[in-house]
Each structure stands twice: as structure tokens, then as C-alpha cells.
Amino acid sequence: MAMPTLDPNAPDFTRRYPNLADPRLGAEATFATDEFFAPKDRMLNPEPAVFIPGKYDDHGKWMDGWETRRRRNGGYDHCIVRLARPGVVKGVDIDTSHFTGNFPPAASIEAAYLPDGEPTDATQWTEIVPSTTLQGNSHAYVAVASTQAFTHLRVNIFPDGGIARLRVYGQPQVDWKGADRTKLFDLAAMENGAYVVEANNEHFGPASRMLMPGRGVNMGDGWETRRRREPGNDWCVIALANPGRIRKIEVDTAHFKGNFADRVSIQAARVVGGTDSSLKTQAMFWQTLLPEQKLQMDLQHYYEAEIADLGIVTHVRFNMFPDGGVSRLRLWGVIE
């Protein structure tokens, strides 16, 4: 499975937060006013959009995305997307790759919180992305300021046309109130609400991929840094899904063979106050949760006895020495 190409011009929210519209996490396009030329499901495909010259089907040119017919009677088209998890949307990427003479001139996005069902005609929608001008074969990145959690989106295109991909970056919201305080939870799982605060280098793959569910599908499905030609090491800071006491750690180098990290260590702290941007410097001085451990290629490494008891922590700094790649990081712990 191909992974989306890193866009150096993409805003930070595309690297920091998971894509809540990822079908691998459970997202689904549930309704569209029209999908004559291309089905709505393609718009959520986690792989980059492709163009296949000369490929046609019964409806015309095959396009990798959602595409509606030409409207002749006024109005506009829309598609309903159920997010993989209820979450606070931080930003969106409306991608029109390969749509040139058939992209919508504009789009907007509305949202609703419907934990127990699907939208109806009576659903009250909140606009989170105002009508935004689109260009063909390009990405429209739009930051979202709302702090409310949503479960569904309504993507409006004016008046018709095609969108190759929709990415909805945000922080999943999990209700921890009734959770078992004796059960181990993966506090580094993005589906539980963990996210990458900052990483010093993400040349070949964003650190957020380490927090994805399941094992990596190939070498592109993980965090990989450039080759380090100077002293030091690579690192990333992760905000845990919930404050907790770490009991078990997994570092998975699946598919990384000639480029896996030689060694790793983890520092941790209970952070009170401050902002995400202030953690970069603080993290250098956090206590050691897991001392340096030698890694092997293409292997799941598990640690329990090696973990220091630091009590309840909220953030970790994951260090790779000196550079390289790691596919997945799991931090199982009991919550506060």
C-alpha cells in the first residue's frame, strides 16, 4: 500500500494529528447526492490519488475520487462522511489531484455530533470550513478553529465536479470516565487520542505513523528520518491519550531492515501547564522511562522489566540513535 507523499508546504496539522476520515480507522462515506462518474468511497482512500490515461468505464473517464455529473438544474452536490472517531477537527485537506477541467470551483464543510445515528433532514449542521475557492490538481489546506467534537461531516461542492481525496485531521475524543483503572490501554494510540507534538525530522515518513493501528504494511508506513551526518540523535515528543502509568512498551521495526534505528530510549514526564510549543526544550530534561535499547531489523521488541516507575505521565520523548526508522510504538499503561 502506497503512503501519501509528504508535502513540504503542508501545515503542521497534517503531521501532528490523525486523519479522522481514514477508512482504515473506520471512517465511511455514507451518502452522496450524486456519484455518477466516480463513487464517494474513493474520496477517502488513504493512498494518493492516481491518474490512468486511457482508462474509461460505462460512465466515462475513470477518475480516482468522488465525481458527480454536470448539474443543469441549479443547486449543488454534497457528501456525508462518518468520521472514524468522534473528534475535534484541526484542519482539512481538500485534494483535487488530477481533476483539471472537472473540479468544483468551491467547497465548504459542515459538521454535526451524532453519536447514536446518522444525519436526517432535521440535523443541525455547524459550518467549520466556509466556502473555499478550489484550484485544479492541487491541495486546499484549511485550518479549523472549532473546539467542539463532531462525528459527521457534510462536504458541499459548488455546484458539482470531483474531489480526489478528503483528509480530515483532528484529535479523537475518548470518554475515559468509565474506563477500567486496572486495564492496560495503549496510551500512544492515535485512535485513543495520542498525537505527535513535534519531531525533529520526518524526511521519509511522519512520526504520527508510529501511532497508527495495526502493523505497518511496508517500509513507507512508519517514521523515518534522513541519514544523520552530524552528532546527535533524532527524536519526537508525543502527547499521550490520557495521563497514565506505563507498564509495557512495544517498538516495532517491521519492514525496516537496512535503515532501522540502531537504538532507542524513552523519556517521560507529567506536564502541567504550558503549551505544546514549550515542550520541545523541556523534553530534553525529562526522566528516563526506558534506557537505551538495541534494536533489530523487522522485529517487534517488547519491554516490561526495563521500564522505570515514574508514576503518572502525560508526555514522552521517543529517541532514535542516531537516526533511521521505526514502524510502530505502543505504550500500554493504566490510566489515572
UniProtKB/Swiss-Prot annotation:
Catalyzed reactions: allantoate + H2O = (S)-ureidoglycolate + urea
Signal peptide region: none
Enzyme Commission number, as recorded: 3.5.3.4
Transmembrane annotation, as ranges: none
Top-tier EC class: hydrolase
Database matches in InterPro entries: Allantoicase, Allantoicase_dom, Galactose-bd-like_sf
Keyword flag Hydrolase: yes
A biological process term (GO) from this entry: allantoin catabolic process
UniProt keyword terms in alphabetical order: Hydrolase, Purine metabolism
SUPFAM superfamilies: Galactose-binding domain-like
Keyword Hydrolase part of the UniProt annotation: yes
MF-aspect GO terms: allantoicase activity
Pathway: Nitrogen metabolism; (S)-allantoin degradation; (S)-ureidoglycolate from allantoate (aminidohydrolase route): step 1/1
Family of this protein: Belongs to the allantoicase family.
HAMAP family found in the cross-reference section: Allantoicase
Record-given protein name: Probable allantoicase
Organism: Ralstonia pickettii (strain 12J)
Lineage: Bacteria, Pseudomonadati, Pseudomonadota, Betaproteobacteria, Burkholderiales
